[in-house]
């Protein structure tokens, strides 16, 4: 993979075999690059021309990278992480027929119960006739616990989490060498 930034003469080659460190001494350039990467990782426009390439294919930074701006306050319950976690749980639920059938049975019972209550009210209602597993997980408030971890444990936990959930192809830390 290649990281191409307009203000740089050379491309940055990214490999699974080693960690790449990019040091930018010029503060104005540093700010522009960080803002550009951050914007692109959150599907916003950037003033900087920054590309992530896999061979000849241009990758979407918002989908294929994860940018950590503040390493001291890593949010393990970021929407991107939780959506991937919910998707992973959903896959496991649908792979096990017994769990899937039991869950569907509970859905039917809950809908019947809510229907009986709604019929007693003098209003007309509309609602989703089906609840997907992700909706149930969000309703249940499933979150990742990471309290009481040291700085290094949080970093390693994040790397493990990204690897297990196959969250992204490139993990980008800002100013991690400062710690």
Feature-to-residue mapping (PLM):
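GG-anchored amphipathic helix commonly corresponding to the ABC/SMC/Rad50 NBD signature/C-loop
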Residues: 151-167
């Amino acid at each position: 993979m290649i990281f191409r930034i307009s203000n740089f003469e050379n491309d940055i080659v990214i490999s699974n075999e080693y960690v790449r460190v990019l040091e930018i001494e010029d503060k104005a350039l540093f700010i522009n690059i960080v803002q550009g990467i951050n914007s692109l990782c959150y599907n916003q426009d950037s003033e900087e021309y920054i590309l992530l390439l896999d061979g000849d294919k241009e990758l979407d930074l918002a989908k294929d990278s994860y940018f950590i701006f503040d390493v001291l306050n890593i949010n393990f319950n970021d929407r991107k992480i939780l959506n991937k976690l919910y998707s992973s749980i959903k896959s496991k639920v649908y792979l096990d027929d017994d769990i899937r059938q039991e869950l569907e049975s509970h859905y039917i019972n809950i809908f019947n119960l809510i229907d009986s209550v709604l019929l007693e009210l003098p209003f007309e209602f509309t609602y989703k006739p089906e609840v997907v597993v992700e909706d149930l997980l969000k309703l249940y408030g499933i979150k990742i616990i990471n309290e009481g971890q040291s700085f290094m444990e949080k970093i390693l936990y994040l790397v493990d989490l990204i690897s297990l959930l196959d969250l992204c192809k490139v993990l980008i830390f800002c100013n991690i060498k400062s710690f």
